[in-house]
Amino acid sequence: MSFFTKLFASIGIGSARVDTKLERDTYRPGDKVNGVVEVKGGAVAQNIEEIYISLHTKYIVESDSKEAMKKTAIERIRINDPFTILVDEIKEIPFSFTLPLDTPLTYGKVKVWIATSVDIKNAVDPRDEDFIDV
């Protein structure tokens, strides 16, 4: 494994990738969200410290007769223990959580999505976003 391969992986080139796969795309507040996070190893073995699933929304705020879009995280869940992903290895980490009852309904410009973030020490952290209908 060359120095350059490790260097490129640390800046995201040839690094591990992440893809979150949900059981479905439409939910109601209080529903169980089931899915799997697929981590695919890159050109070098890397230590995966943490994987987080977080629920986000974008909503409209009105102030002084002006509208602005705001983003916020509703919930954040850690789904793994630290592990090493090997070159070209594929690992699937299952997860499940209950969609909070105060999750806003999606309509118009109001959006809800599940973001996945992977913490890789000394490297660019891969991310994934999956929009859902509520």
Describe each model-derived feature in a short phrase.
Residues 1-134:
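N-terminal onset of structured domains
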